[in-house]
């Protein structure tokens, strides 16, 4: 479940560990053992670094001022200011990840962890970290909140240390030259081969002592679209070259399967991932939508980090994982007079202390290596027991214990002091009031949003078409009563300047049709514009996703296909969020026509002659129009108020003229003792001549449970509708059993105020992981009385 989060973390080289109960499954000795084994393997061939030729250097700078500013920034980046001797700061850190299956759906918090600590650093003694508060919540799986057994390596960032990487790239230690194995640093020596530089805006401000600080922007664009390259806006102090603020993002998203193929080819490795694995876990992408960094001036001289944040998303097959890391720092003093105790030096590694020879382990026999492995494990067990005894002795005398370790490739020795009662960390008054609070003031959200505006459509990688990528898999495969079995191939190519092209040919067997899409897109990492042509099978349903893989399983296995379909071909211009949700719009011109049922085959049909329901008779015509949709989630705390809103509007003219709009709202609230309740209210109205394929339908898992969609039953289809749903549930670990009652109506808009008897149903269900999966056993009340079982994804509650 956490693979998508880890994929995104890998994309920008951040180590994010989320433990659900229990202790870490690795010790220092096991790490030494792993490193030792790794030393025994053949090293892969290194990725070649592009040399900076005179031609590349000449084309790297738009003007001489950009060249001069980059040179100054490089020197400042590696220069250590010996005048900065110490600081005393409070550090806040928050890491959040969500999880969903649809581009449009409720924002679900998969996990959130946060901590606050006092960090005192001195050039002579390293960093002393007093952990003041720490807590983790996993609201989708209640009772698994992990607030104990804190790992000091995962706690509290260090605001500054000699050699710190100012741009938050890599392992935290600045490298003077570009490393082609990592994200290519835009300020490192040799970056001219990968980037182009231009001077941007400039600003200045006056300090209280009358000193004027001048800042200048350096706009950096990669020469080609590649996930290892970033686009960004970087501001520097003109007098010193120190970084003051920055905003950057990946130039394009990371296609993880493409990266795997590239690494396999680089290593001359024939052991490629099986095609079946790719099909099951595709697509697999990660996108770093934006990193913002803000520095503050302290003592009139020292630029120190004040706030930094990274935001992105990952997709692994059907899973969508938005991700955010936020850090902020507040300084009580800089170059204060407080003294810090000396931190003990790092102990000698077990490998060196036990076998202090220079012999490479590949040069010794297999029997000798096995003997050494066992000796390392035994020595590590002894060391671990000694550490436990020392910790117990500290807790018995002071109520706190201190652990010592090295961070950032041994650059900084760190002492972390924390209370022995780990539950006290979760109750700390130093933490924000609620872990579910957005933290606008704490993490400087307004300033971050202002910085992100610089990453607009004008800041893009250069024009350099890349090799196309090919994607197939379960997410492109479906089954329904019109197409039968249908699958497609997704072909994409990055062109540069923010442009890309995408083709998706699709074949279906039952109706013997060839459909497809051809689109050109332009994006800036957060928003995307698409222009293209298409020939599609469309679903009329406003709720649920009848053409998804999950709905296809119901159709294939149980003969249950709740979608109503029609065909269309045309062209459209659309705008959307890259990560899904939020505000989307679409301008279209298309021809629509009927899509008759072409197959009755399903497993239920083969075993018990279960028949699919008939499809609607679509009205043929050509129209042009516009539609918009906006979804938003307010609140993340399952025990507090949460509101999911989904609003839609559409208008078209041509063969038939119409306008339609709908609003869907679900309000939920924890009632205490693990009980939760939710109420849904939804309604839609239309004007003009609404064709059958754009009407509303009542019945099914996403509207009134206990009733199947119907084109003939009263109150189940029309040019207006209303819907109400109520649920009461009790939360257990990962599962929320519920009881529910649904009522709704669809019909002629003139009958809105006197609809007659509405459609209704009631039942019991189970919501897994806060509605990510859902199973309902329902009983129809009106018009049909029958018992139905529904299994589906992405429920409202």
Regions inferred by a protein language model and the residue ranges of each:
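Outer-membrane beta-barrel "beta-signal"
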Residues: 628, 764-772, 786-797
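Structured extracytoplasmic
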Residues: 15-231, 250-260, 267-278, 287-289, ...
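Extended lipid/amphipathic-ligand handling interfaces
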Residues: 238, 290-300
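C-terminal outer-membrane beta-barrel translocator/porin domains of Gram-negative envelope proteins
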Residues: 149-160, 165-176, 453-458, 477, ...
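Solvent-exposed loop/turn segments connecting transmembrane beta-strands
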Residues: 226-229, 476-487, 494-498, 503-516, ...
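Sec-dependent N-terminal signal peptides
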Residues: 1-14
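Residue-level detector of the transmembrane beta-barrel scaffold of outer-membrane proteins
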Residues: 90, 245, 500-504, 528-532, ...
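Short loop/turn motifs that connect adjacent beta-strands in outer-membrane beta-barrel proteins
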Residues: 81-83, 208-212, 444-452, 458-468, ...
